[in-house]
């Protein structure tokens, strides 16, 4: 059989009935099933002759008309695909099965492909029960002939009628006279990039179905568990939203949006007269294009390259306009019949046509006269559909759902633009909402064609072929409403499109292709433009706007020539240092939603910088509002840092100069002080208070003169013995002695004068005494330098009023003066008389001198004792203890014995921009506690300075005979850690020295320690 020539084969076309019969007896694949009326009377045990007669009679009646039609056709007509009865399933045709519509590709396949599979056990049972109509050798011969004839097929059948080019649309419907384009041989295996196994024929075995078909819609799909799957298995079970269950039909333009109609299942249309062609006329070689609805169950999923959803692009790479949620705060939730709140509907809005993206305008453009079409896909994911909604707590049943379209101005969302819809005669009418239904777990697709904007946007006129800066925009708003039975309508969901320009001119003619990039000039490899350039955003904020990071291997250069500048003034650096101290440098992370929008990685989220709002309070000109967010001019902050650095350098230079001057001055003063001290020590050794030093000096002088005379006499005698010519030398010796005596007399006068001055200073000037007996040698007064705070306290302050100057009662107790009373027990105690207290030399004079004027500290700093109602000012300064140039103020505050040993409250008022630093007690000062032994304080027992409130402190001065406390005022809270040598710089220092003045003025005072 394999060596037969096709020319030598029998002529099967002359006897089609014989071929059909041979096919019937040779295949024996499917057992013929009798009609319902005869199925009850037949059984395998009946007479085989009766069975054969039944099948022959049925075959003769069914093929009578069909045989006549085939015999009428000429030889050329047998080439029609419908005339190829080689693979005609006569058993199914005899059964009058409604599902006999086999795919066309089935006629191209032989039985060797085994597209129809039967279980081997069931096949053997059918063969055992089926009567033998022909001998076995005849069946084998017919089967071999059938295989040979199948090998003769060399040309494919006419392809299926499917518009894969998407030329059909709602605006240009296909006609019956148009012919499909020529299809090559492999067209049957082409389906938008989707591979079709088994040459497009779906086998009965459900397990061979590709997995991508099962993922056609949602994962809510189960396998087909039917025990007897039909010839065309249902890929989706009953509870799955199959395309066949869609309420609305799919628009022809929806092809290519993720679904493609399969060209595998074009059924044979049987006419009323049971003929295959439905007409006695001979059909044409080319079948006409038919506008017939495809069975939705045959829609196959065709993967589309690229992104889906809002970023799906149209054919040719044009992006589709995107829709976003709109007025979400006005959405009304839906409820089921039980009053349970349902989830939001899954809505996808797609503009099928009418919107063209303009790269020059950076937005979508719509031509007002050309309509646009919108497809809305709605799916309820809940098991129950929406039944009602609530208004003011009242549940109202839903009667219907409506889909409405309206335009809105981008700059004013409250201004709405009506949408019109053209009729089939292209007559525009006002658009009315479209009614639709929502079925649980089903997808509803609503396509609304022929829509128009009733107005055009403003400022559409171009300026020099560039976008108008005053261009206005529209937004297309899609709203889903729910209407109750009483007429109440609420907004379910709403979506707004991107901004759109609506023009009265066709966008294609408005922007010629050669003029789209007219603003860009290309000169060799250089591309230039005079307009702004935007990367990653839609609106320019500057000449170059970049939404993201900029990587540059070089530097960013900009001109700074003096020829380009005018009104050049030097900026002062006075406030730069203070502004820099107010800046706060922080580490921060961008919010996750911002990082996702800007495309930042986790490492790029962390930044170091300043906060724009905080910087605006310090440097307003460094912050700009360019639209959505505040931006920082970092160069302005940089130059402010340069100014602050210059100010620091200037302050450092001034401090260095002052330090050098002061060191030289102190060195000179120390030299003079050392010379005076040496002279005073030598003079004080020969002076006393009774004037005996003068007699001793005279005696010493006489003794010296006598000794000198005796010596000279002896020398004269020796010299006279040696040489009598030496007599004139004695005269020179007498002159020398007289000169020495004169010098000694002058020295005595000078010493007397110095003694008188020293006595005057000890009795009429401010001096210090040394209460500690352990100190080696007496320490002198301060001189012209700042007083060293060790243990000096003034003996008398006539201008400084003491704390509690007199006893307010007849009998008062004395505090912390036991040691003083022991040392001055022999002194006379006078009665206190308020009338004569001012004339008493031993009392405290609260009045100031006539030449004393209260000036304050000059820095708006006020120190007071609120409990005693006293003001501490310059009256408590002694000689050189308050130096304004150095900003050091040492205030000596006397306390009488009548002040109890209780803590004192000190209040220091400073300007709001400054801070008071509590530095505690002065360690180098000789702090002496009130006790019977009078010993100095230990490390564990020291004066205390505690802050009670802002600028209010409590010191333990009442419990100490003498104690010192230090406070510093400045712009920082770390002033106490600065070295003491940095005077006159960033802070002011106030030293409060409290000491007991124990000279009593009242005999009735009782000493209490």
UniProtKB/Swiss-Prot annotation:
What does the record give as EC number? Answer: 3.4.-.-
State a single Gene Ontology molecular function.
Answer: DNA-binding transcription factor activity
Which residues are listed under the site Cleavage?
559-560
Highest taxon of the source? Eukaryota
Keywords, alphabetical: Activator, Autocatalytic cleavage, Cell membrane, Cytoplasm, Differentiation, DNA-binding, Endoplasmic reticulum, Glycoprotein, Hydrolase, Membrane, Nucleus, Protease, Transcription, Transcription regulation, Transmembrane, Transmembrane helix
Modification(s) after translation: Myelin regulatory factor: Follows autocatalytic cleavage via the peptidase S74 domain. Autoprocessing is apparently constitutive and is essential for transcriptional activity.
Q: Which residues have a glycan attached per UniProt?
A: 999, 1002
UniProt-annotated stretches for the region Disordered: 161-293, 688-731
Q: Which GO terms describe its biological process?
A: cell differentiation; positive regulation of DNA-templated transcription; protein autoprocessing; regulation of neuron remodeling; regulation of synapse assembly
Q: Which residues lie on this side of the membrane: Lumenal?
A: 758-1009
Q: Which GO terms describe its cellular component?
A: apical plasma membrane; endoplasmic reticulum; endoplasmic reticulum membrane; nucleus; transcription regulator complex
Residue spans of biased composition, Polar residues class: 205-217, 234-278
PANTHER family given in the database record: MYELIN REGULATORY FACTOR HOMOLOG 2, PTHR13029
Give the family this protein belongs to, as stated in its UniProt record.
Belongs to the MRF family.
Subunit structure and binding partners: Homotrimer. Interacts with myrf-1.
Q: What is known of its domains?
A: Myelin regulatory factor: The peptidase S74 domain, also named Intramolecular Chaperone Auto-processed (ICA) domain or Intramolecular Chaperone Domain (ICD), has protease activity and mediates autocatalytic processing of the protein to generate the Myelin regulatory factor, N-terminal active transcription factor and the Myelin regulatory factor, C-terminal components.
What name does the UniProt record give this protein? Answer: Myelin regulatory factor homolog 2
Gene name on record?
myrf-2
């Amino acid at each position: 059989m394999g060596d037969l020539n096709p020319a030598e084969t029998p002529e099967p076309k002359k006897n089609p009935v014989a071929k059909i019969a041979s096919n019937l007896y040779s295949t024996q694949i499917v057992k013929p099933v009798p009609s319902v009326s005869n199925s009850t009377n037949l059984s395998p045990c009946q007479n085989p002759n009766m069975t054969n007669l039944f099948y022959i009679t049925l075959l003769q009646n069914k093929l009578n008309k069909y045989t006549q039609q085939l015999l009428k056709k000429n030889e050329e007509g047998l080439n029609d695909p419908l005339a190829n009865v080689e693979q005609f399933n006569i058993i199914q045709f005899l059964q009058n099965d409604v599902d006999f519509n086999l795919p066309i590709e089935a006629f191209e396949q032989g039985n060797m492909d085994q597209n129809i599979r039967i279980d081997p056990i069931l096949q053997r049972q059918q063969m055992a029960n089926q009567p033998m109509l022909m001998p076995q050798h005849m069946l084998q011969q017919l089967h071999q002939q059938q295989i040979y004839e199948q090998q003769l097929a060399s040309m494919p059948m006419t392809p299926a009628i499917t518009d894969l080019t998407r030329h059909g649309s709602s605006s240009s419907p296909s006609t019956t006279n148009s012919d499909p384009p020529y299809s090559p041989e492999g067209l049957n295996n082409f389906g938008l990039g989707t591979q079709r196994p088994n040459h497009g024929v779906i086998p009965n075995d459900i397990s061979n179905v590709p997995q991508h078909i099962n993922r056609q819609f949602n994962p809510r799909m189960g396998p087909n568990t039917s025990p007897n799957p039909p010839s065309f298995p249902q890929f989706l079970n009953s509870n799955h939203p199959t395309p066949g269950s869609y309420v609305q039909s799919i628009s022809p333009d929806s092809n290519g949006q993720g679904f493609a109609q399969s060209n595998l299942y074009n059924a044979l249309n049987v006419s009323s007269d049971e003929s295959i062609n439905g007409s006695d006329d001979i059909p044409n070689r080319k079948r006409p294009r038919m506008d017939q609805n495809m069975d939705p169950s045959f829609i196959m999923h065709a993967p589309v390259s690229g992104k889906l959803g809002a970023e799906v692009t149209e054919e040719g790479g044009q992006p589709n306009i995107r829709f976003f949620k709109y007025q979400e705060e006005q959405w009304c939730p839906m409820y089921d019949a039980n009053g349970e709140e349902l989830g939001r509907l899954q809505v996808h809005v797609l503009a099928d046509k009418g919107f063209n993206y303009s790269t020059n305008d950076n937005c979508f453009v719509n031509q007002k006269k050309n309509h646009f079409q919108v497809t809305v896909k709605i799916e309820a994911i809940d098991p129950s559909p929406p039944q009602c909604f609530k208004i003011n707590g009242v549940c109202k049943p839903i009667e219907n759902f409506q889909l409405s379209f309206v335009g809105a101005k981008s700059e004013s969302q409250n201004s709405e633009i009506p949408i019109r819809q053209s009729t089939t005669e292209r007559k525009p009418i006002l658009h009315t909402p479209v009614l639709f239904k929502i079925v649980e777990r089903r997808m509803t697709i609503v396509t609304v064609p022929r829509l128009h904007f009733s107005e055009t946007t403003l400022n559409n006129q171009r300026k020099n072929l560039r976008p108008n800066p005053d261009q206005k925009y529209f937004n297309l708003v899609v709203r889903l409403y729910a209407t109750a039975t009483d007429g109440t309508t609420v907004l379910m969901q709403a979506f707004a499109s991107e901004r759109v320009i609506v023009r009265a001119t066709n966008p294609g003619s408005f922007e010629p292709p050669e003029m789209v990039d007219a603003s860009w000039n290309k000169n060799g490899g250089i591309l230039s433009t005079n307009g702004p350039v935007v990367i990653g955003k839609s609106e320019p904020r500057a000449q170059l706007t970049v939404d993201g990071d900029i990587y540059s291997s070089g530097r960013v250069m900009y001109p700074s020539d003096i020829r380009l500048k005018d009104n050049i003034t030097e900026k002062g650096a006075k406030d730069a240092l203070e502004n820099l101290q107010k800046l706060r440098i922080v580490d921060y992370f961008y919010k996750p939603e911002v990082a996702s929008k800007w495309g930042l990685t986790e490492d790029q989220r962390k930044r170091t910088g300043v906060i724009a709002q905080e910087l605006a309070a310090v440097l307003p000109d460094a912050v700009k509002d360019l639209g959505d967010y505040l931006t920082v001019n970092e160069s302005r902050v940089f130059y402010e840092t340069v100014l602050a650095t210059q100010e620091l350098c200037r302050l450092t230079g001034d401090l260095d100069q002052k330090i050098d001057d002061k060191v030289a001055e102190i060195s000179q003063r120390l030299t003079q002080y050392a010379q005076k001290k040496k002279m005073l020590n030598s003079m004080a050794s020969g002076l006393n208070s009774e004037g005996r030093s003068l007699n001793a000096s005279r005696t010493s002088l006489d003794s010296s003169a006598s000794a000198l005379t005796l010596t000279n006499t002896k020398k004269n005698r020796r010299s006279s013995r040696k040489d009598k010519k030496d007599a004139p030398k004695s005269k020179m010796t007498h002159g020398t002695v007289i000169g020495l005596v004169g010098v000694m007399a002058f020295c005595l006068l000078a010493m007397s004068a110095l003694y008188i001055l020293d006595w005057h200073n000890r009795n009429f000037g401010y001096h210090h005494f040394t209460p500690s007996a352990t100190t080696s040698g007496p320490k002198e007064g301060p001189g012209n330098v700042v007083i060293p705070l060790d243990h000096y306290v003034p003996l008398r302050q006539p201008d400084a009023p003491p704390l509690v100057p007199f006893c307010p009662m007849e009998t008062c107790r004395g505090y912390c003066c036991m040691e003083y009373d022991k040392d001055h027990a022999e002194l006379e105690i006078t009665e206190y008389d308020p009338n004569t207290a001012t004339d008493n030399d031993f009392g405290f004079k609260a009045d100031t001198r006539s030449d004393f004027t209260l000036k304050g500290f000059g820095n708006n700093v006020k120190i007071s004792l609120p409990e005693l109602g006293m003001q501490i000012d310059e009256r408590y300064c002694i000689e050189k203890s308050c130096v304004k140039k150095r900003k050091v103020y040492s205030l000596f505050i006397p306390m009488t014995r009548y002040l109890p040993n209780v803590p004192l409250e000190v209040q220091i008022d400073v300007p709001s921009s400054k801070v008071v630093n509590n530095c505690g007690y002065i360690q180098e000062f000789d702090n002496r506690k009130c006790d019977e032994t009078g010993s100095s304080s230990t490390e564990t027992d020291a004066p205390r300075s505690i802050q009670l409130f802002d600028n209010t402190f409590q010191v333990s001065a009442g419990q100490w005979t003498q104690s010192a406390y230090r406070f510093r005022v400045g712009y920082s809270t770390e002033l106490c850690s600065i070295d003491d040598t940095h005077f006159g710089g960033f802070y002011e220092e106030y030293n409060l020295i409290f000491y007991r003045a124990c000279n009593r003025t009242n005999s009735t005072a009782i000493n209490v320690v």
